[in-house]
Amino acid sequence: MDFLTMCMLAAGFGMAIGAFGTGIGQGLAVKSAVEGVSRNPGASGKILTTMMIGLAMIESLAIYVLVVCLIILFANPYKDVAIKLAETVAK
């Protein structure tokens, strides 16, 4: 496999794993918040505020994964080295 194909696969798998993890984390957070509100409806405002802050923290992981994947795809610092290496091997 050439370098660009490996970069695309790495970015795809990285985003898939990151999205899977954040989806599971957000689902568990919402489940716990709903259970907490059903047990104590009087504390729903405090629970929902804490849940929203937690969801923002969890979602930031997906944003960081997206940024790293975009760097791998479009601003890879090793791209020039890999292309030169491939050219010398091809000769």
UniProtKB/Swiss-Prot annotation:
Q: What is the name attached to this protein's record?
A: ATP synthase subunit c
Location in the cell:
Cell inner membrane
Pfam families in the record, alphabetically? Answer: ATP-synt_C
- GO cellular component term of the entry, any: proton-transporting two-sector ATPase complex, proton-transporting domain
Top-rank taxon, per record: Bacteria
Provide this UniProt record's keywords sorted from A to Z: ATP synthesis, Cell inner membrane, Cell membrane, CF(0), Hydrogen ion transport, Ion transport, Lipid-binding, Membrane, Transmembrane, Transmembrane helix, Transport
**Residues the record marks as site: Reversibly protonated during proton transport:** E59
PROSITE patterns under this entry?
ATPASE_C
> What does the subunit comment say?
F-type ATPases have 2 components, F(1) - the catalytic core - and F(0) - the membrane proton channel. F(1) has five subunits: alpha(3), beta(3), gamma(1), delta(1), epsilon(1). F(0) has three main subunits: a(1), b(2) and c(10-14). The alpha and beta chains form an alternating ring which encloses part of the gamma chain. F(1) is attached to F(0) by a central stalk formed by the gamma and epsilon chains, while a peripheral stalk is formed by the delta and b chains.
Q: What HAMAP family does the entry give?
A: ATP_synth_c_bact (MF_01396)
Sequence similarity: Belongs to the ATPase C chain family.
An example of a GO molecular function for this protein is:
proton-transporting ATP synthase activity, rotational mechanism
Q: List, alphabetically, the InterPro entries matched.
A: ATP_synth_csu_bac/chlpt, ATP_synth_F0_csu, ATP_synth_F0_csu_DDCD_BS, ATPase_proteolipid_c-like_dom, F/V-ATP_Csub_sf
Q: What does this protein do?
A: F(1)F(0) ATP synthase produces ATP from ADP in the presence of a proton or sodium gradient. F-type ATPases consist of two structural domains, F(1) containing the extramembraneous catalytic core and F(0) containing the membrane proton channel, linked together by a central stalk and a peripheral stalk. During catalysis, ATP synthesis in the catalytic domain of F(1) is coupled via a rotary mechanism of the central stalk subunits to proton translocation.
Bilayer disposition of the protein: Multi-pass membrane protein
**Entries under PANTHER family matching the protein:** ATP SYNTHASE LIPID-BINDING PROTEIN, MITOCHONDRIAL, ATPASE PROTEIN 9
Please list every transmembrane segment annotated in the UniProt record, as residue ranges. 4-24, 53-73
